[in-house]
A protein has these predicted regions:
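Gly/Ser/Thr-rich active-site loops/lids in small-molecule metabolic enzymes
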Residues: 279-285
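An acidic, glycine-/histidine-flanked metal-binding catalytic module
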Residues: 286-290
């Protein structure tokens, strides 16, 4: 019988956050590809575009005018997925629970990260920009909105912060921006994750799990996981870390270059719990991760990035108390700047069993985390920033 080798043989990996298995098929990256490909072109965008509805001072589609902002700018989304309208819920459970409907109320906001149209988070790490000067204000805006929205809107239970970067992820405008959705319910995935965290802490079998403890003195799922990854021989899945946060490829990753950013020194439930030093650490690691992404294939790396944290203070129950702040990066690229991974077929048909096919090997036969770590050994100067690209063309 052939000895099992995870780097070569199909297998399943357990995702303890969602309590599902992920099917890993490392040999699949060797198949020939004649499918769709993304453009690798990097257009030289201007710092200001008079037709952009996110640039400072410009008029949006509704006629509202943007402030002449110089750092971050937040406004309520006029084309929101949710509306702040209170409606009377009706009892629709009259068909054996098969046709249930529940009203969804909320507010949506747009967060412009920077006034310059041609910047990304990744490019804010390279001179004349810096994480201290240009990314910290973004985190301050996130924190302020988390606190302000919950204080001003008692119906809100959960605030989802996220960014879709690049046309491959459905982004309709290249101007650096993210979104905030304030919901009157806790979404399915954050609820599952909170439940998993609570159950891990409450399970007596985990009493001696390593890592920092929850404020109630119990072990914590992600803090224990971060501790074990940081103490694994060679740290094979750790991408980078600083004084407060670690960026790593999750053991159960679905996307080839998926990354999770999480604290490893102490329990942080939400942005409200951060010290200024921790905000600085988060700014630096976000800048580093996104910069390394771009440098990997020398392209503006597309991704969806989202923050999981506690529900708003007035909506916190016993489950919410165990929610740990962490960030997910889901980039679609597979083996180059032009070939992406698609979640189709088997993934959709067996979603209850697996989240996808984890490609543990890249085109050169080494795992994605090793590709990233190899690239991360280089300086974190951004190779596709406007300044660097102009210099390289001279």
């Amino acid at each position: 019988m052939t000895p099992f080798q995870p780097s070569q043989h199909p297998h399943r990996r357990w995702n303890p956050l969602l309590q599902t298995f992920v099917l890993c098929s490392p040999h699949r990256t060797q198949r020939p590809w004649q499918g769709a490909q993304e453009s690798a072109d990097l257009p030289l965008l201007p710092a200001y575009l008079d037709t952009c509805y996110l640039c400072p001072g410009n008029t949006r589609a509704t006629g509202a005018q943007n402030d002449p902002y110089t750092q971050t700018f937040v406004f309520e989304n006029e084309f929101a997925a949710l509306k702040d309208v209170q409606v009377e819920a009706q009892d629709t459970d009259t068909h054996f629970g098969l046709f249930r409907i529940a009203p969804a109320r909320g507010k949506c906001y747009v967060v412009c990260f920077h006034p310059h149209h041609n910047l990304t988070l990744a490019q804010m790490t390279t001179a004349p920009y810096s994480a201290e000067t240009h990314i910290i204000p973004i985190i301050h805006a996130w924190r302020d909105m988390y606190m302000r929205i919950s204080a001003e809107n008692p119906f809100v239970q959960y605030i989802q912060l996220f960014e879709n970067k690049g046309s491959a992820m459905g982004c309709s405008n290249p101007h650096p921006h993210g979104q905030i959705w304030a919901l009157d319910y806790v979404p399915t995935e954050p609820m599952k994750v909170m439940k998993s965290m609570y159950e891990f802490s409450a399970d007596p079998a985990n009493e001696h799990a390593p890592g920092p403890r929850h404020p109630h003195g119990r072990p914590h799922l992600l803090l224990a996981y971060a501790h074990m990854e940081l103490h694994a021989p060679g740290r094979p899945r750790v991408v980078t870390l600083n004084h407060d946060f670690v960026a790593l490829v999750p053991f159960w990753a679905v996307w080839p270059f998926e990354i999770m950013v999480l604290p490893y020194k102490r329990f942080l439930g939400s942005l409200q719990d951060f010290t200024e030093a921790e905000i600085s650490s988060l700014a630096h690691i976000l800048g580093e991760v996104t910069c390394r992404y771009d440098n990997l294939f020398r392209t503006s790396f597309p991704y969806s990035m989202g923050i999981h944290q506690k529900p708003v203070p007035h909506a916190q129950d016993s489950l919410a108390l165990y929610a740990l702040f962490h960030i997910h990066f889901y980039p679609p690229l597979l083996r180059s700047a032009t070939v992406r991974k698609f979640l189709v077929g088997y993934v959709f048909l067996h979603a209850s069993l697996t989240l996808g096919l984890k490609c543990w090997q890249s085109h050169n036969g080494i795992s994605p985390q090793k590709v990233q770590r190899k690239d991360y050994e280089h300086a974190i100067r951004h190779t596709t920033s406007p300044v660097t690209r102009v210099h390289n063309m001279l």
